[in-house]
Amino acid sequence: MQLIKCLVIIQLSLLLVEESFAGRDFYKILNVKKNANTNEVKKAYRRLAKELHPDKNKDDPDASTKFQDLGAAYEVLSNPDKRKTYDRCGEECLKKEGMMDHGGDPFSSFFGDFGFHFGGDGQQQDAPRGADIVMDLYVSLEELYSGNFVEIVRNKPVTKPASGTRKCNCRQEMVTRNLGPGRFQMIQQTVCDECPNVKLVNEERTLEIEVEQGMVDGQETRFVAEGEPHIDGEPGDLIVRVQQMPHPRFLRKNDDLYTNVTISLQDALVGFSMEIKHLDGHLVPVTREKVTWPGARIRKKGEGMPNFENNNLTGNLYITFDVEFPKKDLTEEDKEALKKILDQSSINRIYNGL
């Protein structure tokens, strides 16, 4: 009897836990693990937003619902406070505590107000268009190696209704003027329509710029309609151009990395073991058991940069060695001992090495 009572209590407890976690599984919606960091959450949302956008899935009657679920999942899992509450007791707790406000628009933060095109006709070619804005984004080599999200806040001019009307859609038309009996003149004049008046107002906008693994210096990301506005047409685009900052230890050439290591003369002669700290913190072991001459270069396969088109492919790391000679003078006894060890005659070869 006591055993049955315990089982009933356990069953009721499980039901209460299940009830407290009622609601959507945001981790499943975003397809991320429960220990996923913020950048992994952002990356998952950005990828899935392209796949699940209703404009790309017009034949799916549930497309809008799926897209809304995706946005809700991102809003919760990208916010530390909301995520902590969600992990504790699910979506119902968020609703009870008023934390599901649905006020955000993550899609526009990642892709701009006008999103992106899915291969359609896009904007009309003849429509007037505002100027593009080019913005340089300075990033570290570490960010280009591992990937990152950079949040930028900018004042974007947007059109708002204003009182009165204005001339719009102005164009040149041919008009016939009567100059008298049997005399006419064709002239060209500007003809405009009357449109509701508008004004430009600066609004603060936040954009999430993804620095993707393997991006190269000068590579551009385009945000449609985030550029200069045009009162009679469409806004231009915002073009974010990656500018790679110099790195103190590594030089990048395409997908390969180059670095220099200075070793002692002793290590150059007898060999050595060391580790090089890579861009993401992992250690690259380097071992030499033979003589290393000044300017010697070795290759570490697969320790370069990830390829932008295919992150499964990586370049190589090339290590060039410099040898530091001792500063102190040797005694005559040391010199003689060294000559015996090296057993090498003088080589005074003169040549043009340039």
Swiss-Prot record:
<dbReference type="InterPro" id="IPR036869">
    <property type="entry name" value="J_dom_sf"/>
</dbReference>
<dbReference type="GO" id="GO:0051082">
    <property type="term" value="F:unfolded protein binding"/>
</dbReference>
<dbReference type="Pfam" id="PF00226">
    <property type="entry name" value="DnaJ"/>
</dbReference>
<keyword id="KW-0325">Glycoprotein</keyword>
<feature type="signal peptide">
    <location>
        <begin position="1"/>
        <end position="22"/>
    </location>
</feature>
<dbReference type="GO" id="GO:0006457">
    <property type="term" value="P:protein folding"/>
</dbReference>
<dbReference type="Pfam" id="PF01556">
    <property type="entry name" value="DnaJ_C"/>
</dbReference>
<feature type="glycosylation site" description="N-linked (GlcNAc...) asparagine">
    <location>
        <position position="312"/>
    </location>
</feature>
<keyword id="KW-0130">Cell adhesion</keyword>
<keyword id="KW-0539">Nucleus</keyword>
<dbReference type="GO" id="GO:0036098">
    <property type="term" value="P:male germ-line stem cell population maintenance"/>
</dbReference>
<dbReference type="InterPro" id="IPR051736">
    <property type="entry name" value="DnaJ-B11-like"/>
</dbReference>
<dbReference type="GO" id="GO:0005886">
    <property type="term" value="C:plasma membrane"/>
</dbReference>
<dbReference type="GO" id="GO:0090129">
    <property type="term" value="P:positive regulation of synapse maturation"/>
</dbReference>
<keyword id="KW-0472">Membrane</keyword>
<dbReference type="GO" id="GO:0005615">
    <property type="term" value="C:extracellular space"/>
</dbReference>
<protein>
    <recommendedName>
        <fullName>DnaJ homolog shv</fullName>
    </recommendedName>
</protein>
<keyword id="KW-1003">Cell membrane</keyword>
<dbReference type="GO" id="GO:0005783">
    <property type="term" value="C:endoplasmic reticulum"/>
</dbReference>
<dbReference type="GO" id="GO:0031594">
    <property type="term" value="C:neuromuscular junction"/>
</dbReference>
<dbReference type="GO" id="GO:0005634">
    <property type="term" value="C:nucleus"/>
</dbReference>
<feature type="glycosylation site" description="N-linked (GlcNAc...) asparagine">
    <location>
        <position position="260"/>
    </location>
</feature>
<dbReference type="InterPro" id="IPR008971">
    <property type="entry name" value="HSP40/DnaJ_pept-bd"/>
</dbReference>
<dbReference type="GO" id="GO:0060250">
    <property type="term" value="P:germ-line stem-cell niche homeostasis"/>
</dbReference>
<dbReference type="GO" id="GO:0007155">
    <property type="term" value="P:cell adhesion"/>
</dbReference>
<dbReference type="GO" id="GO:0005178">
    <property type="term" value="F:integrin binding"/>
</dbReference>
<dbReference type="GO" id="GO:0051604">
    <property type="term" value="P:protein maturation"/>
</dbReference>
<keyword id="KW-0964">Secreted</keyword>
<dbReference type="GO" id="GO:0051787">
    <property type="term" value="F:misfolded protein binding"/>
</dbReference>
<comment type="function">
    <text>Maintains stem cell niche architecture in the testes. Activates an extracellular integrin beta-PS pathway which regulates DE-cadherin (shg) levels in somatic hub cells, and is essential for maintaining the number of germline stem cells and the structure and localization of hub cells.</text>
</comment>
<keyword id="KW-0732">Signal</keyword>
<dbReference type="GO" id="GO:2001046">
    <property type="term" value="P:positive regulation of integrin-mediated signaling pathway"/>
</dbReference>
<feature type="domain" description="J">
    <location>
        <begin position="25"/>
        <end position="90"/>
    </location>
</feature>
<dbReference type="InterPro" id="IPR018253">
    <property type="entry name" value="DnaJ_domain_CS"/>
</dbReference>
<dbReference type="InterPro" id="IPR001623">
    <property type="entry name" value="DnaJ_domain"/>
</dbReference>
<dbReference type="InterPro" id="IPR002939">
    <property type="entry name" value="DnaJ_C"/>
</dbReference>
